[in-house]
Design a protein with these regions (language model features):
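Short acidic, hydrophobic short linear motifs in intrinsically disordered regions
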Residues: 34-46
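Short, amphipathic alpha-helical interaction segments positioned at domain boundaries
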Residues: 85-108
Length: 270
């Protein structure tokens, strides 16, 4: 196991809207363009702009430092752990480059049998695959769009599950029922719809007059969706699927808020 300076825990269970989740969103958005460092005072101020009091803000900072995302540096400053950069870059691609499947795109099947003696590996593999948006075909067998192959390979390495897994790529899965019906079994479409509904409701509550807070809360609310929703092709989804509305809301608000939010951050961090 790596030291805190090299090992970073991806806090995938951080609930959107929580202090820890908002802090991670601020770090992911702004520490790299700020040069990788920020003062403790500036970080607490930015969290204050999100309505978070100093005490819980400092508690959250301590938590993400313990997770390895931040490193304490001299002068009451925090630096982004270089080991976290690949994780954040993967997140950028998923969050800002939304991709949906089209007819004829390949699928990736992941078959894994993890020994009982390594139950922790099995649990991590299952939870990470589900967060990645994989559907469950059968116990030990998952399916994703093939364009996620790189993320799946990284996940298998990070969870130490690669020796137990075999990957298959196909353009023509043939379940015993129509593929649309099979997809409804493999993915919990009701839960995915609820995530879209939650996001769209959160968008309605944003105050664009405070662009920094609105943008961070937009990103924090959105960040789960591009993971848990695999972007299935339209012909496998209900006719009233809300995915396109969510994407349009996110991209439109991002375009309106991002620049003003960045100006605010630079002013606080200067």
């Amino acid at each position: 196991m790596g030291s805190p300076a090299t090992r970073v825990v991806d806090d995938i269970d951080a609930r959107p809207g929580s202090t820890t989740s908002l802090l991670r969103t601020v770090i992911g958005l702004y520490l790299r363009p700020l040069g990788g460092e920020i003062s403790s005072a500036a970080l607490v101020t930015l969290l204050g702009d999100l309505g978070i009091q100093p005490a819980p803000a400092r508690t959250a900072i301590t938590r993400v430092k313990q997770k390895g995302l931040l490193l304490a540096t001299p002068g009451a400053r925090y630096a982004l752990n270089p080991a976290a950069v690949p994780m954040l870059e993967r997140g950028d691609r998923r969050i800002f480059e939304v991709r949906t499947m089209t007819p004829g795109d390949d699928w990736l099947l992941i078959s894994a049998t993890v020994p009982e003696a390594q139950r922790d590996v099995r649990h991590q593999l299952r939870s990470r695959l589900l967060f990645l948006g994989a559907g469950t075909v059968a116990p030990g067998l998952w399916i994703t769009p093939a364009h996620l192959a790189g993320e799946v390979e990284a996940l298998l390495d990070e969870t130490s599950a690669r020796p137990f897994a075999t990957l298959f790529r196909t353009s023509d899965p043939q379940p015993s029922v129509p593929l649309r019906d099979a997809a409804a079994r493999w993915w919990d479409l009701d839960a995915l719809r609820a995530e879209h509904d939650r996001f769209l409701a959160s968008v309605d509550a944003l105050d664009e007059a405070a662009p920094f807070a609105a943008y961070v809360r937009l990103l924090d609310s959105w960040r789960v969706l591009p993971y848990v929703d695999p972007g299935l092709p339209a012909e496998l989804l209900p006719a009233d699927w809300p995915g396109s509305r969510s994407i349009a809301a996110f991209t439109g608000l991002s375009a309106r808020l991002a620049d003003a939010a960045w100006v605010h951050v630079r002013g606080v961090a200067a």
